[in-house]
Curated annotation (Swiss-Prot):
UniProt-annotated catalytic positions: 174
Binding site for substrate: 33-36, 224
Pfam families: GalKase_gal_bdg, GHMP_kinases_C, GHMP_kinases_N
GO annotation terms (biological process): galactose metabolic process
Magnesium as UniProt keyword: yes
Keyword Methyltransferase: no
Stated name of the protein: Galactokinase
Top-level EC class as recorded in UniProt: transferase
């Protein structure tokens, strides 16, 4: 259905059939939150919700782009000769950003494209719609221009676009999880070294439920950059006493020795979260490999509590979802996922209890918050693909 809409929209806007169709997933992070920029381990996986594209290579230097998610903007047109950021160009700044970074890196891109996209990720829900779009664009350009970009390089290019062009100080996790995604596997990623390992997601007779607060979160102007600065400031202080390049190089035991050097109580709590969360990721992956799903779920719960109390990035909406999820029968664990401040939480729920879970948590959320949450049963899909 989505592909038919995509094709007909392409024909309506550009007067011809598209050459190619593509898909790029969104992602959830099972555990390891707000530590990708602190040199920690994360454990994300791609989901089957994501961003679809229809695209055709042009024979001039013009790009024309249309999004079914932002129909009121119409077709946005620009030239490869002017890839400067313009606020009014909205989502196409991601397209311009990827083009600019690739061209600056010496990749030969000398023709424009016609592009229609349609995403079924809830916008602003913290499921990485922007990284999904970046990896989609890299995949399209890689395919059209035979650029031979590795999956790891694709992720690094997306991160560079985010940091230097869009102006969001994000880590590597989202792009990496999407670019290197494989069906039914999560990725244990060391964000310091980019060492990674695929771990089969054997959840037995349980499913991952995505719970969307339907409270939009805007990464760029949320407290995300503030948290990053608190961590960077703490790292600068700790570097005077110990030879580390990121917070997550310390164990909780080692941090005990140095924690009195962090005088600001807020910054101290940020460090406690980062260092303990990194240890939780390692413990959680070990538990999953040993088929100890109960422990995996408990670690998810502990992660949410740390994000709530020490990192302070959850808020009433996410806490309402997680805390009500914990009370339900058949629930192994639940936590916020993504950057927080709204967005989504996830829960691992026994298949026999899914309907009851959605009903009960949904009602509790509506009673407490005043509007409805949305629920999705997550499937773990592949990375960016040409369809």
């Amino acid at each position: 259905m989505e592909l038919n809409t995509l094709k007909s929209t392409f024909i309506n806007n550009f007067g011809k059939e598209p050459n190619s169709l593509f898909f790029s997933p969104g992602r959830i992070n099972l555990i390891g939150e707000h530590i990708d920029y602190n040199g920690g381990f994360v454990f994300p996986c791609p989901i089957t919700l994501g961003t679809f594209a229809a695209a055709t290579l042009r024979d001039d230097r013009i790009c024309r782009a249309y999004s079914l998610n932002f129909e009121s903007l119409g077709v946005i047109e620009f030239s490869l000769d002017d890839l400067s950021y313009k606020k009014e160009d909205n989502w196409t700044n991601y397209l311009k950003g990827v083009l600019k970074v690739l061209i600056e890196k010496g990749y030969k891109i000398d023709k424009g494209i016609d592009l229609v996209i349609n995403g079924n990720l809830p916008n602003g829900a913290g499921l990485s719609s922007s990284a999904s779009l970046e990896m989609l664009i890299v995949k399209i350009l890689d395919t059209f221009f035979s650029l031979n970009i590795s999956k790891v390089d694709a992720a690094l290019i997306g991160k560079e676009v985010e940091n230097t062009y869009i102006g969001v100080n994000s880590g590597i996790m989202d792009q990496f999880a999407i670019s290197l995604g494989e069906k039914d596997k999560a990725i244990l990623l060391d964000c310091n070294s980019l060492y990674y390992e695929y771990v089969p997601l054997n959840l037995g007779d349980n499913s991952i439920i995505i719970m969307n607060t339907n409270k939009r979160r805007e990464l760029a102007d949320s407290k995300y950059n503030e948290r990053r600065k608190e961590c960077d400031d703490s790292l600068d202080t700790l570097k005077k006493y110990t030879n580390i390049s990121s917070l997550c190089e310390l164990t909780s035991l080692e941090f005990e020795t140095y924690k009195d050097k962090i005088e600001d109580s807020n910054k101290l709590r940020r460090c406690v979260h980062a260092i303990s969360e990194n240890e939780r990721v390692k413990d959680a992956v070990k538990a999953l490999k040993e088929n100890n799903l109960e422990l995996f779920g408990q670690l998810m719960n502990q992660s949410h509590i740390s994000l709530r109390d020490d990192y302070e990035v959850t808020g009433k909406e996410l806490d309402t979802l997680a805390e009500n999820a914990w009370k339900q029968p058949g629930v192994l664990g639940a936590r916020m996922t993504g950057a927080g401040f709204g967005g989504c939480a996830i829960a691992i729920v026994n298949n026999n209890h899914v309907d009851e879970f959605i009903k009960n948590v949904g009602q509790a959320y509506k009673d407490a918050i005043g509007y409805e949450a949305s629920f999705y049963v997550a499937s773990i899909g592949n990375g960016p693909t040409e369809l």
